[in-house]
Amino acid sequence: MVIINGQPLLFKGTNRHDTDPVYGKYVPKDVYEKDIETMKSYNINAIRTSHYANDEYLYYLADKYGMYVMGETNAECHALMWDQDPVAQYLKPLTMDRTNTSFQTLKNQTSVVMWSTGNEMAYTTNGADNLYTDMIAYFRDRDTTRPVHSEGQGRNGGTDTDSNMYPTVGTVQDKAGEGKMPYVLCEYSHAMGNAVGNLKEYWDAIRSGSNMLGAFVWDWVDQSRAISLDNLPKNYSITDKSSFLQQEQFIFCYNKISYE
């Protein structure tokens, strides 16, 4: 159990990218504020800044509106899926520098209640020359007040929380119980197509144990872009990948929980 102001912490959260259909990855202040206000109206109380720090205005709004933030380091670890040793000598110093930047930038932000070492870290036990454990230790050595999250690393990696992406309801239920590590779903219920239909079952499992810290749905708003097409009078949404003509990208349009 994690306690804040005498009350158990329970994330009813969402992952959030900096994205806008018109402005792309430049997000104006009014979009930030609309995001936070809409989250509050949806009974969302937490944001995982996937997968990097945001503009300082987001943290100001999180403080203002009373939102919890999982402060995530700008570290994408898909490259280590197979423990690629040639990558390690280049990746580790760069990633440790980003870890330091994340900490120094966010350490005084009231809304940041948990550190996250980055994204997709469960594919390997500890790739890139002990990178994961060193990132975890960096935060723990400098901040004893906030728990540290690192997906899939668990107690052996030195984290304060157990965590998975997209576990089954049964797996979540198995994680609940007295004496077990605090557990959080850093991503679940991918809101794509005909999805998000079993939130009740997930939350029945989450609420069944005092060690459960809640969950962050993937994800907040669609990452598509509004573009015009020849001979068509309206704008159409595509992903910001290489080309909307790639069939595998079609399914990423309108991949979100919010239609604001």
Pin down the residues of each PLM region.
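N-terminal carbohydrate-binding accessory modules
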Residues: 1-39, 60
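Substrate-binding/catalytic cleft of secreted carbohydrate-active enzymes
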Residues: 36-42, 46-253, 257
